[in-house]
């Protein structure tokens, strides 16, 4: 199965603000960004899966496929009480503690990276068993990084070493018969 993991376009929010699962719209550059992304994609997808957040759903609407699915498991990391707060304001003991152990520790009223990984891999393992040839998945950088880490068996505390710009496309070629997974970045 050929799977394109596509990061959403630029969200409508100031730089330096923590936004995770906040449902943000996209900027005025959406159409131009969308057209660039679409020029890199296939035209014969069997299905499109998307995070339900607007910044993903808008892009997913532009990708042609006979089947469409919105799936909460594809949502970004939930930063809880820190959503919509400036990153540079994270000076409390809770925030310092979280930054030192973001894999296991949840943001207040949010989720840990382990919880996020479990929901993302639940989706991923289900998708790998599905009977599709070509699939597009419109999602967030956190989801892309976790799938990348899973496929390459990378420790979760290293996932932020992978830089992903808005509109980044990862292509995963999955063959369960050969137990072979390859990734390339488009």
Task: Locate each region found by the language model.
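Short, solvent-exposed aromatic-acidic interface loops
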Residues: 182-186
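Generic beta-sheet signal
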Residues: 3-4, 131-141
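Active-site-proximal alpha-helix that buttresses catalytic centers in soluble enzyme cores
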Residues: 3-66
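Short beta-strand scaffold positions
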Residues: 50-51, 118, 138-139
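Domain-level recognition of soluble alpha/beta enzyme cores
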Residues: 155-180
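GST superfamily/GST-like fold recognition
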Residues: 141-145, 168
């Amino acid at each position: 199965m050929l799977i394109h993991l596509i990061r959403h376009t630029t969200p409508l929010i100031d730089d330096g603000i923590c936004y995770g699962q906040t449902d943000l719209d996209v900027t005025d550059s959406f159409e131009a960004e969308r057209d660039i992304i679409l020029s890199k994609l296939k035209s014969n997808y069997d299905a499109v899966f998307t995070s339900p957040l607007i910044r993903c759903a808008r892009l997913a609407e532009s990708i042609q496929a006979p089947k469409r699915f919105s799936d909460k498991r594809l949502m970004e990391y939930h930063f809880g009480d820190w959503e919509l707060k400036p990153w540079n304001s994270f000076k409390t003991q809770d925030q310092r503690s979280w930054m030192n152990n973001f894999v296991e520790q949840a943001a207040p009223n949010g989720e840990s990276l382990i919880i996020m990984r479990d929901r993302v891999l639940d989706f991923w393992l289900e998708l790998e068993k599905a009977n599709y040839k070509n699939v597009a998945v419109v999602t967030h950088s956190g989801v892309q990084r976790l799938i990348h880490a899973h496929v390459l068996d990378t420790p979760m505390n290293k996932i932020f070493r992978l830089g992903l710009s808005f509109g980044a496309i990862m292509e995963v070629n999955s063959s369960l018969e050969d137990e072979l997974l390859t990734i390339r970045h488009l």
